[in-house]
C-alpha cells in the first residue's frame, strides 16, 4: 500500500520522523517535508553556538536522510500561511507536526520587557536570517537568566572577543556585530539552588 505523508518542520525531529516513515517495511511511504526556513535542520543549524562544530556535525547524518529518494524537502513554506493544515489533510494520508519550540517565553518580572529572549539572541549569533543583525552590544555588564546549556552558550559567546570567535563557524556579518561587544562581566542567574552533588559515604 502506498501512502503520502506531510511532515511539518525540518529540524532533527522532523527529519528523523521522515526517516522512520520512509523505512517502514509494511507500507510504501513517500514524505514531503515542509520547512519555513530556506534550509533545514532547525535548532541544529540555528540554535547551536558557533564554537560547537562537533554538535553541528550531526547535520551530516541528517543530510543522508534528506538525500533519500522517497523524501522531498520543501523549504520557504510556512504552514498556516502558505498552506493550511486542512489543505495538507486533504492532500496527504497523514500529517506529522514537528515544529519545535518557536518562541521565547515572556519574562514576567518588573523590567522584563527590556530583556532579550535566548532564542532571539541565539538566532542572531547563529546567522538565522529571520533575526535582527544590528544589536546594541554596549552594555559592560550582562545578566543571563538560567544555567542550562543555552545560557552557558550565550554567556560564553558574550564573554569572548570578536577575534576569539573568528576561528569558529560564526557568520561574517555576526562577527562584525560581535566585534562591538563591550561586555566585560557576564552574570549568570539561577532560579534554582546549585550545589555540590551529595556523595554517599
Question: What kind of feature is each model-predicted range?
Answer:
Residues 5-26, 154-158:
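N-terminal Rossmann-like FAD-binding beta1-loop-alpha1 element of flavoenzymes
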Residues 28-35, 166-172, 183-189:
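Short beta-strand "acidic-cap" motif of Rossmann-like dinucleotide-binding folds
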Residues 30, 38-94:
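N-terminal Rossmann-like dinucleotide/flavin-binding domain of flavoprotein oxidoreductases
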Residues 94, 98-105:
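Glycine-/small-residue-rich beta->alpha transition segments that form the dinucleotide
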Residues 192-201:
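Single conserved hydrophobic/aromatic residue that forms the stacking wall/gate
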Residues 2-11, 139-145:
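Beta1/beta-strand and adjacent pyrophosphate-binding region of the FAD-binding site
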Residues 104-180:
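Glycine-rich dinucleotide-binding loop and its adjacent helix/turn
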Residues 13, 39, 102, 150:
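Conserved Rossmann-like nucleotide-cofactor binding loop
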Amino acid at each position: 500500500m502506498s501512502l503520502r505523508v506531510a511532515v511539518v518542520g525540518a529540524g532533527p525531529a522532523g527529519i528523523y520522523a521522515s526517516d522512520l516513515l520512509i523505512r517502514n517495511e509494511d507500507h510504501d511511504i513517500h514524505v514531503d517535508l515542509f520547512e519555513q526556513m530556506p534550509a533545514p535542520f532547525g535548532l541544529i543549524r540555528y540554535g547551536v553556538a558557533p564554537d560547537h562544530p562537533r554538535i553541528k556535525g550531526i547535520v551530516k547524518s541528517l543530510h543522508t536522510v534528506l538525500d533519500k529518494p522517497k523524501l522531498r524537502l520543501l523549504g520557504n513554506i510556512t504552514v498556516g500561511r502558505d498552506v493550511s493544515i486542512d489543505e495538507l489533510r486533504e492532500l496527504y494520508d497523514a500529517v506529522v507536526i514537528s515544529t519545535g519550540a518557536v518562541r521565547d517565553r515572556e519574562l514576567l518580572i518588573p523590567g522584563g520587557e527590556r530583556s532579550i529572549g535566548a532564542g532571539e539572541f541565539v538566532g542572531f549569533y547563529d546567522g538565522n536570517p529571520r533575526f535582527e543583525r544590528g544589536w546594541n552590544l554596549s552594555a559592560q555588564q550582562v545578566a543571563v537568566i538560567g544555567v542550562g546549556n543555552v545560557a552557558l552558550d550565550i554567556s560564553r559567546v558574550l564573554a569572548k572577543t570578536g577575534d576569539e570567535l573568528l576561528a569558529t563557524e560564526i557568520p561574517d556579518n555576526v562577527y562584525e556585530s560581535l566585534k562591538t561587544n563591550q561586555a566585560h562581566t557576564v552574570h549568570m542567574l539561577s532560579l534554582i539552588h546549585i550545589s555540590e552533588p551529595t556523595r554517599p559515604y
